[in-house]
Design a protein with these regions (language model features):
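Mature-chain termini and adjacent capping regions
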Residues: 1-189
């Protein structure tokens, strides 16, 4: 009789341990699925256009892209061919374009990468070759401050000359540019 009770106790313990193992295994699998699902995008977009206005109701900035993918877990939006129209205090529109862009929601920044171009909208719409342009490989645009920064090499071309530098800060709302290092300029009036 004692052996039957011992055998019954052993079988009950084995079944209990087996059920606990199955629960732990399925919980781990479910958690992995939830984590991998949160890394997936929640929407894709074609022809993105986003406008921001000042408190007075004036257009401050417009962001456009041919394609966008939003990742909610990272609070990140990837943009293809982003184009930013930033309007300065005098009403002039500056255009920032690149091949790729990454909008970080928490930092309120837009990182433009690959063939970044900054130029006045008037020149882009004129149909003539650009007379004033700024080129670099990467530029971080701080959307709230209307400020753009890079630590990469920069080339500024104008009708009268050329400036090469490493790093710059552009205050788009004030039309001011500060070059950070290795500045070389050529001017021909």
């Amino acid at each position: 009789m004692l052996r039957k009770r011992f055998l019954l106790l052993f079988i009950a313990a084995a079944v209990g341990i087996g059920l606990l193992w199955i629960e732990d295994y399925t919980t781990a699998q479910t958690q992995e699925n939830i984590e991998s699902a949160s890394l997936l995008p929640d929407y894709y977009g074609e022809g993105l256009r986003n406008r921001s206005y000042t408190e007075e109701g004036k257009l401050e900035r417009e962001v456009m892209a041919s394609h966008s993918i939003h990742y909610p877990a990272q609070k990140l939006t990837e943009l293809d061919e982003p184009k930013v129209h930033s309007i300065d205090n005098d009403g002039e529109t500056w255009v920032l374009t690149s091949i790729l862009g990454f909008h970080y929601e928490e930092r309120k920044t837009l990182v433009l990468q690959q063939d970044v171009l900054v130029t006045p909208l008037v020149e882009l719409n004129s149909g003539t070759p650009l007379q004033n342009s700024i080129r670099t490989t990467e530029l971080t645009f701080y959307t709230e401050e209307q400020l753009a920064k890079t630590d990469k090499p920069v080339e500024v071309l104008s009708i009268n000359g050329q400036i090469n530098a490493v790093g710059m800060i552009i205050r788009l709302d004030q039309q001011k540019i500060e070059f950070l290092s290795q500045v070389k300029a050529r001017y021909a009036p």
